[in-house]
């Protein structure tokens, strides 16, 4: 039986009952329009915790003006079916006014690690992400929180926030879930036309090319990135936002691979911005 909480207070009431029984709690934060990638996070959380809270909340403060806040896909009825089927028992689905009181003036900034990759072109994005995730961790009193590697920089940023603020929660990163043809599953894939959907495969092909080169011994970032960029630029519908290699622990640009690295990209296919990545040497 799935309990739907629409306010933090309702969720906290359920959580306090769980905690009183000594139960462990897993948290899966989402923006809804759930797919098999989210489902894999929920199932892992269910396997590793006594109870699981999933949040479904399109977080307005992580969108900049002109981004897709208003058009971001929503289908809460379908989300509820997937959440219940995956075994979670609590979903928090608040309105923005329920999570952010009108005179709220506290935000969570993680500096440095947010300056590269998505943070370059979306400078306020991670402030919004960290603020809402911090709130959800507080509401849920989670023992573990689950995030997909598709948003690899987000995963690194949240780990840093939890470390720096001595938060009592384990951050669990989970593998990217892909379509059969390799495209990373994303709620934004629904924006793509049939032609764009085919063109979008250039991201996973670039990932495969980068992995192939590095597994064959290539350690020059420029060589790997140039090969990936050439592949993407050959697709007429693709426009590169960034293709970069950074250290996995500090998200700082590297020239030569001598430790774990994140190779990440953001690419516009038509008007839709898609991301993909791989981690090497972890």
Regions inferred by a protein language model and the residue ranges of each:
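Nucleotidyltransferase catalytic core that binds NTPs
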Residues: 2-237, 246-248, 279
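Phosphate/ribose-recognition catalytic cores of enzymes acting on nucleotide-derived substrates
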Residues: 227-282
